[in-house]
């Protein structure tokens, strides 16, 4: 029995839903009923008892419109063939994370809005899917996972011992301009280390990504990592007399260097109040691709240079030195980064950043927690799939079923169910043919699902407690007792 809730425009201070029952009946034609010209749907846009959000008006014409079968722009369906690829990718994420000793966590998709706007940066704030819920609370769909991680670490307090090595794979939402490999929803793999101040943490994180790339067939000639430090930009701004309070804004602008024309970068930097001379010098230094050249410009005594030298030394020890390069322009757009930052990039330049991360030592204290050192990375699913397509490295992942069980007589459907249950109890996958079908159809289905063997339940064999088994790869066929069927 179905019911539709329709709410009148405002009968009182609280909703009084009108219930229309028995709209659909299998034994009689649908009843005719009239729909008011103007309705308010209680479920739409979060409208509820608080009255905090006014729901859109729905007309009778709207009610009868054909539903758009496509998902909302920027989102995806995952039919079986795409789900197999997603599971394959996620399994690699999980296996690599566990290989490095990390534990899996997860967080709510819906969080308080303040969690993301406090320290995320202007770009993230502009891209939030946020709204007011029925309790007049500002909430948002998570655009990333790191703030949720910080919240959970603070919540757990002293019940967890440091260092923490956690990973997560979660769906994230950003209302951004879509490009190849960039959607408004995506799944993101994060690995984070809480409680380690040394550069060894960043070195291990990059090592884990390299391990992942190698597992799926990506080489150092396909992708690389651009590495720098936020402290480099801090020292440069200090050298050129740029006020410290402009640092966050400048980072957001510099992060666009490879995305918009350089004249636009200069114009945006000019709007911050930085002099033309300082802008020219700053951009000249940020074009440096050699750590030695940077050291000549800002001196070798700075903390940024020491950290970066150590990272490159550790890269040799971990065995991925050919994967990384210095690039002073890498700053990352998120406001909470404090030290080393890195981005994975496509060496052919056809895709945007594949992954990115860095150190965020002060993020937890921003939310009221202790000032723990921390670093991590985020790795989206959409870009890597595009890269695998580009390199012709997508795996062939057909459906795989060990057994197809089929009754040769409609009166033996119950017997076929018994056989299927016996095999499933032994941990084997079974596709049970639920209708009476000709053998030609069954063989076609077996080929489609890549079945290993066909188990046929015939009247004569079943009376003897046996079934016929056909091994599809070799054509071998034999009869076996149900109790001996493995």
Curated annotation (Swiss-Prot):
Disulfide bridge positions per record: none
GO cellular component assignments: chloroplast; mitochondrion
Origin superkingdom: Eukaryota
Catalytic activity reported: tRNA(His) + L-histidine + ATP = L-histidyl-tRNA(His) + AMP + diphosphate + H(+)
Keyword annotations of the record: Aminoacyl-tRNA synthetase, ATP-binding, Chloroplast, Ligase, Mitochondrion, Nucleotide-binding, Plastid, Protein biosynthesis, Transit peptide
Example of a GO biological process term: histidyl-tRNA aminoacylation
Pfam families the record matches: HGTP_anticodon (PF03129), tRNA-synt_His (PF13393)
GO molecular function: ATP binding; histidine-tRNA ligase activity
Localization per Swiss-Prot or TrEMBL: Plastid, Chloroplast; Mitochondrion
E.C. designation(s): 6.1.1.21
Main location group: plastid
EC primary class: ligase
Entry's family note: Belongs to the class-II aminoacyl-tRNA synthetase family.
Protein name: Histidine--tRNA ligase, chloroplastic/mitochondrial
